[in-house]
Amino acid sequence: MSPQTETKASVGFKAGVKDYRLTYYTPEYQTKDTDILAAFRVTPQPGVPPEEAGAAVAAESSTGTWTTVWTDGLTSLDRYKGRCYDIEPLPGEESQFIAYVAYPLDLFEEGSVTNLFTSIVGNVFGFKALRALRLEDLRIPPAYSKTFQGPPHGIQVERDKLNKYGRPLLGCTIKPKLGLSAKNYGRAVYECLRGGLDFTKDDENVNSQPFMRWRDRFCFCAEAIYKAQAETGEIKGHYLNATAGTCEEMMKRAIFARELGVPIVMHDYLTGGFTANTSLAHYCRDNGLLLHIHRAMHAVIDRQRIHGMHFRVLAKALRMSGGDHIHAGTVVGKLEGEREVTLGFVDLLRDDFIEKDRSRGIYFTQDWVSMPGVLPVASGGIHVWHMPALTEIFGDDSVLQFGGGTLGHPWGNAPGAVANRVALEACVQARNEGRDLAREGNEVIREATKWSPELAAACEVWKEIKFEFDTIDRL
């Protein structure tokens, strides 16, 4: 017998394939405060027991592979392996269950959302033993979240920078999103800001196309910002989209924005990638720029109920990677979002400590230990009649963003902005007086139309516009 064979035998190596559950299903395991916890919705192939499927998820997203390998004897699997510690049936779903998996902290690089996702969701979703797999939630322990900078500034610092308190902020996405020249684009920005909005915005796919190169757009938008500020006495901003084909180009655009003296830039964090986003967030903190985040591509990942990843996980990842705003659905507009589920991840974005609440889809108590919060952005198919509901649902710490609901005003861009600002001020005043916006919202808007012909015209245009499709984002 060779020395190598003797060594393998001495550590108990036995080649072959064994069930995952023998190693990775540990219902007796007591989770640690430092563990990263995951809740997976698992749909196994017919004939695969839940314990085996849950253990396979834990194995393939941590230390496991399809066969026994002799190098297992060179490390401590018990220290590094993921563990499926609980299986929870789903009422009314015979073929699905929730598998809870605990991962030891040492499996993950500090301060890297990229490494976190590569480990937990990078490979296991293509596993043949599973028909479908969805990551519903993650618990990020303080020991790990403290390795991240998080948002460049956070909610309170942003309000202090803007000197705006006691109400939601108002925004507008410039439309048409593609095709305008830089000068005409800047004109629309000026008209909206002059009319009373706090922000205007590049759409997610406005980067640097032949009809409008990024440098020209940045310059004309900066001119619009300064002109509107001088005329209104308010601090204004435009989300200048720095997203680019390379990280170097992205940083060049952010640096140019800072040199122009504008307050905020923007990034598409999913298409741009977490590594690029974290780099940009660090630059923004160091240089006093706010960072608006668009979630373009999120529905490819999060819209299916049984496969992919819920947006609450993407929201937590963004808070760690860094962003001061992120789009979060509207509940009442044209884009997906069920009320309680939406408010669940809105709280995960804004609050320091969020209790477990399965009625809102929150599987774990989350303690952010003073990491700055992120402002949720409500955007997509909303107009002045939605203002009471949006004010009541999202509260003051939010951005309400009306694209077509501003630029579609029959009198033009500036009157559209005036209508939205008047509607917002009326709703905030009514709420502060103790009125119930959920019940009296339409009456509040009608009363305000007496003092604002711009609002009256907007109410007439959009009085019958509704998006009455059922949401598929349900618990």
From Swiss-Prot:
<feature type="binding site">
    <location>
        <position position="295"/>
    </location>
    <ligand>
        <name>substrate</name>
    </ligand>
</feature>
<comment type="function">
    <text>RuBisCO catalyzes two reactions: the carboxylation of D-ribulose 1,5-bisphosphate, the primary event in carbon dioxide fixation, as well as the oxidative fragmentation of the pentose substrate in the photorespiration process. Both reactions occur simultaneously and in competition at the same active site.</text>
</comment>
<keyword id="KW-0479">Metal-binding</keyword>
<dbReference type="InterPro" id="IPR017443">
    <property type="entry name" value="RuBisCO_lsu_fd_N"/>
</dbReference>
<feature type="binding site">
    <location>
        <position position="379"/>
    </location>
    <ligand>
        <name>substrate</name>
    </ligand>
</feature>
<feature type="modified residue" description="N6-carboxylysine">
    <location>
        <position position="201"/>
    </location>
</feature>
<keyword id="KW-0113">Calvin cycle</keyword>
<feature type="modified residue" description="N-acetylproline">
    <location>
        <position position="3"/>
    </location>
</feature>
<dbReference type="GO" id="GO:0000287">
    <property type="term" value="F:magnesium ion binding"/>
</dbReference>
<feature type="binding site">
    <location>
        <position position="204"/>
    </location>
    <ligand>
        <name>Mg(2+)</name>
    </ligand>
</feature>
<dbReference type="InterPro" id="IPR036422">
    <property type="entry name" value="RuBisCO_lsu_N_sf"/>
</dbReference>
<keyword id="KW-0934">Plastid</keyword>
<feature type="active site" description="Proton acceptor">
    <location>
        <position position="294"/>
    </location>
</feature>
<dbReference type="GO" id="GO:0009507">
    <property type="term" value="C:chloroplast"/>
</dbReference>
<keyword id="KW-0120">Carbon dioxide fixation</keyword>
<feature type="site" description="Transition state stabilizer">
    <location>
        <position position="334"/>
    </location>
</feature>
<feature type="binding site">
    <location>
        <position position="173"/>
    </location>
    <ligand>
        <name>substrate</name>
    </ligand>
</feature>
<feature type="binding site" description="in homodimeric partner">
    <location>
        <position position="123"/>
    </location>
    <ligand>
        <name>substrate</name>
    </ligand>
</feature>
<dbReference type="GO" id="GO:0004497">
    <property type="term" value="F:monooxygenase activity"/>
</dbReference>
<keyword id="KW-1015">Disulfide bond</keyword>
<keyword id="KW-0503">Monooxygenase</keyword>
<keyword id="KW-0007">Acetylation</keyword>
<keyword id="KW-0150">Chloroplast</keyword>
<keyword id="KW-0601">Photorespiration</keyword>
<dbReference type="InterPro" id="IPR020878">
    <property type="entry name" value="RuBisCo_large_chain_AS"/>
</dbReference>
<feature type="active site" description="Proton acceptor">
    <location>
        <position position="175"/>
    </location>
</feature>
<keyword id="KW-0488">Methylation</keyword>
<keyword id="KW-0456">Lyase</keyword>
<dbReference type="GO" id="GO:0009853">
    <property type="term" value="P:photorespiration"/>
</dbReference>
<feature type="binding site">
    <location>
        <position position="177"/>
    </location>
    <ligand>
        <name>substrate</name>
    </ligand>
</feature>
<dbReference type="Pfam" id="PF02788">
    <property type="entry name" value="RuBisCO_large_N"/>
</dbReference>
<dbReference type="GO" id="GO:0016984">
    <property type="term" value="F:ribulose-bisphosphate carboxylase activity"/>
</dbReference>
<dbReference type="InterPro" id="IPR033966">
    <property type="entry name" value="RuBisCO"/>
</dbReference>
<feature type="binding site">
    <location>
        <position position="327"/>
    </location>
    <ligand>
        <name>substrate</name>
    </ligand>
</feature>
<dbReference type="GO" id="GO:0019253">
    <property type="term" value="P:reductive pentose-phosphate cycle"/>
</dbReference>
<dbReference type="InterPro" id="IPR036376">
    <property type="entry name" value="RuBisCO_lsu_C_sf"/>
</dbReference>
<dbReference type="Pfam" id="PF00016">
    <property type="entry name" value="RuBisCO_large"/>
</dbReference>
<comment type="similarity">
    <text>Belongs to the RuBisCO large chain family. Type I subfamily.</text>
</comment>
<keyword id="KW-0602">Photosynthesis</keyword>
<feature type="binding site">
    <location>
        <position position="203"/>
    </location>
    <ligand>
        <name>Mg(2+)</name>
    </ligand>
</feature>
<dbReference type="InterPro" id="IPR000685">
    <property type="entry name" value="RuBisCO_lsu_C"/>
</dbReference>
<dbReference type="InterPro" id="IPR020888">
    <property type="entry name" value="RuBisCO_lsuI"/>
</dbReference>
